Amino acid sequence: MTSTSEQPPSQRPSPWRPLALALLAVLGLLAIWSKIRDPEEPTATTPFVEAPVDEVTRLGLVALRQPSTGTLNVLVVFAQFQNEIGLGERIPDYATRMFDPDTPGSFTHYYNEMSFGQLQINATVLPRRYTSTQPASAFLADTSTEYGGYGDFSHEIMKQVDADVDFGQFDNNGPDGVPDSGDDDRIVDYVFLIMRSVPRNFLYGGATGIKGLGRDVVTDDIGAKGRKIMVLRKGYTGSIVAERPYAQTVGIMAHEFGHGLGLPDLYDTSFQKVANQDPADDSAGIGRWGLMGRGAYGWTEDASQGPSPMSAWTREQLGWVGVDNDQLQQVIMPAGGLHLTDVRHGGSMLKVFL
């Protein structure tokens, strides 16, 4: 993916070209997150393959995104196809622990650590699994180079959920921090749709995760301003992910939610548009060094250590280098005496201009 550059002020010496480096903290200055695999869940080696993003998102030019500070109310829905109904409606035992803020390795703990507490995630996990009225085959694309019918699937599931849930309680992006209070936008903050299985060509080829729900849903719930609450198909309001063991599921969700914050992928996605090109033969971008690269599973393919921390560049974009980037130190001129210490304990991240 292409990363944006930053132009230093004109008074800076001309020998220094205004190209912003990926921050030095990628190696030593990332906040080291304590990552623990759920001991009750086996590890697995299921690769995470993401569906292609649109050009605007690819360039990091998302006009609409979730705020990176405050409190968001997230709805979590587990779902399956009609042909899986024999497996029952029970959700995974780890489902609620994924959002325990006091559990290292949870989704909520991860984003609390990365944001220095500036973004709080309140999640509601629905207690049963929802089932479509049609089998998986009804939603599959004919080829691996076109999108599948995941939008129709998600629309049906959201309509089922609408009978059980007041979607107004998940519209909480206004300044007062109170859901559906009148200062919100009548759009549900964020929905995770977690699939028991993701067959090939359901999303896009072999993808197991995608930003966006594919279709808008107008719910039956009336908001504070007398208008119906909506669930939008856009990538900043939801995602569809494959159900995996605990740590893998958290990693995929964390990556997709990053798109909801307006972050681009930090790896080369050309393999998704070139027939028979192996992803391993292409550029991995920042690789496993950051969540928005290939870091959803962390340093091991079984995700036993949880997702990688966000890169320093990513955190700068969100204002998360300390609180409102107050620990970002810009190095404009050659300087000595710089010390790299843990950002969790007041250390700085360095941004070096060349």
Where are these regions (language model features)?
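N-terminal module-boundary/linker segments of secreted carbohydrate-active enzymes
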Residues: 33-102
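Extracellular hydrolytic enzyme modules, especially secreted metalloproteases
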Residues: 190, 196-354
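Active-site-proximal segments of metallohydrolase catalytic domains
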Residues: 65, 109-226
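N-terminal Sec-pathway targeting helices
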Residues: 9-22
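Hydrophobic membrane-insertion alpha-helices, especially the h-region
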Residues: 19-32
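Active-site-surrounding "flap" and adjacent substrate/cofactor-binding loops of secreted or lumenal enzymes
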Residues: 85-125
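N-terminal intrinsically disordered, acidic low-complexity segments at the extreme N-terminus
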Residues: 1-7
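Loop/turn elements at helix/coil->beta-strand transitions in domains of secreted/extracellular proteins
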Residues: 71-75, 186-191, 287-288
